[in-house]
Every structure is written in structure tokens, then in C-alpha cells.
Amino acid sequence: TFNEAYMMHTTPSPHYGIVASTETAAAMMKGNAGKRLINGSIERAIKFRKEIKRLRTESDGWFFDVWQPDHIDTTECWPLRSDSTWHGFKNIDNEHMYLDPIKVTLLTPGMEKDGTMSDFGIPASIVAKYLDEHGIVVEKTGPYNLLFLFSIGIDKTKALSLLRALTDFKRAFDLNLRVKNMLPSLYREDPEFYENMRIQELAQNIHKLIVHHNLPDLMYRAFEVLPTMVMTPYAAFQKELHGMTEEVYLDEMVGRINANMILPYPPGVPLVMPGEMITEESRPVLEFLQMLCEICAHDPGF
């Protein structure tokens, strides 16, 4: 209860570092100099996209892919059209959604464009942990995708560092190095479990669990029907303040009103809000959470 109250009444807004950064960015965007900065970011992002495609074409076996149209020569936001297949969305309205060139989404093996699962897969969470070991922070991680933002602070050196880290990961993965050598932070979470495990075994362990639960279908069903809103988040928080809550196991959530937000990370998107209740109709939400718990129980650190 204390933690919930603290998070509700505190904010990073007055943080001087954030305020200074915002003011500096606003000043940098003024006039033609700001336009040059933005154009430079777009150009670097497009060059990075093309380099990933080139490496994918020249690589033996697998390599990362980029979520983007076939033709990216124009420096503009690319529309997601209903007659295109590259984006994987169905029944969308034309001119409704666009892809920002500076938002680069890399794809790892495991899921086809039509949502079917492959026999071979490398969950993106493993790649994200490897990049973190090398000082590269991923903006958002999905099951088989990684989002990077080519903002005005990303120069050529940083883009090359990311490329080098990705190629190093492929090389280490293909050599099937030990987890403790590739992911020392993960190894320290459970040294006994990861002592002799190699990176390909770890990837296949998680990938098989995702295939077993048929993740694309599960995610579709989980977001198709939202949990039922029984009371407002404020009313749910008042219940907690007055000690009118209890802890229950995840398996017992159906028919119970949530007092707290459930927010799996990554990607950090709330699945259940305070005051909402999972019903039989929204049970896929619970099944998705159970799948995440099973992965974590099977492979510590995930």
C-alpha cells in the first residue's frame, strides 16, 4: 500500500536533469539548425535500415530483419496500407497509420509475417539482455522484435556500435557459446541453473514455450476482449487504503476485482488496471500472464 501511494503522489517531472534536457532539446530544434538535425537523424536511420538488409542478404543462415516497406528511399513517414503485406496487420484503413523512419524495429527469427511460428527462433528478450551487457538500451522489447529510436542524439558512432553488437551476437550465437560468457548478468541470477547451458539451448527453451502457447493467437485473443471495469481506479485504491484487499494466486483471478495494475515488462504495457475484473470472456488475458510466469519459472531471469 505504501509503495502504491508513493508512486501515485511522486513524479519525475521536477527532476532538474529531465527539465534541462527538455529545454536543451527545444532550443536545438529552433530554425534551420533543428531541421538539419532531424534530417540527419532520418538519414542515419535509413542508412542503418539498409545496412541491416544488406547484412541479412550476405549472412550465412539467419540474421536480423527490419519491419519496414520494401522501398524506403523516400525520407517520409511510410503508410501502412491495406493492400500491403509487410506490416502484418489485417483489415486496416488506408492513411490511418504510418511508420516513422526514425523508429527502427528489428525482427529476430521465430515468427513469420503472417503470424505463424517457425521451428527455429531467437526470442528478442535474449538479444536485449546481450545488448544491455554492452551498454545499449532497447527502447521496447517484444517477443521477437526490438525497437530503437534514432533521435537527434544518435550519431554515426552509436549506430555503428549497435551494428557491431548485433553482428557480434550472431557470431556468438552461431558458435553456441555458454550463457555465462554471453550473458554474465543473467548467469549471476542463477549460476547453478545456467552453469553448463549454451545460448542456443536457452533460445530454444523459451521459443518452444512460446510455440506451445501459440503466442500470436493468444495475444490476439487477450487484446480482443478487455477486462470488465467494475469500479474506478480511485475506488479500487480507496479499498486498498482501508485494508479491504487480499492477495490471491494468479490462477484465482477470474471473478476478482484487481486492486493494483498488472504490467508485464517488457514491454511495460498495462494488461489489467485497478478496478478491472478478469471474466471468462477475458480469460485469455490471464492465460497470457500465466505463459509469462511459466517462462520465468522455466528460465530464471525472464
Where are the language model's segments positioned?
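Non-catalytic terminal extensions of PLP-dependent enzymes
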Residues: 32-302
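Conserved PLP-enzyme active-site core in the AAT-like
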Residues: 1-56
